């Protein structure tokens, strides 16, 4: 009986939230949300271990509604992927949903929850990395403060609550001044470091919305990299709800 009681106490201890970790995660979340709608341009560069590159150009649109966000990514170049589009729907509760339109077969394919850990369009970003994150979908723990480059940062550990996530945990570096996510280390289900994300060149748009100019994902296993270069941010442009559903995927231009 005593052993059982101690075991239950241990489980309860692990389940307890870390107030400081949650507080910092919420502060970082506030930098991502509240923009209403937006659009931007994106250049995706795939980089091989030998330094060979392949470039893709995209348009990205997003719209917030009822506490959730939908994001539409449309490939314009190169020709073999032009017209391919990914629609992601994410929110603080429930499973994220994603649909991929493939123009070659004129078909919309839903990305199943068990497949979201797979690579997005041959990049080092997984489908689950593309969906807008919400702090409620992780268990957080504050670890320490330390330098990250020239900045002072908080370091958090977060564990995905989604049992189908490809990650067991992520280490997140937030700068202390603005609570912007500067670095993430992703660990697989076996606890091994699988890739590292860094964000640089942050700019504040309209005096409120922080966005990075560049994101870099580096695969620790094979040396491949994917660089995302962002530009042309516009906010509050009046995108319609009808632009963010499965039917809209087949008529994107």
Feature map (PLM): residue ranges:
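Sec-dependent signal peptide recognition
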Residues: 1-7
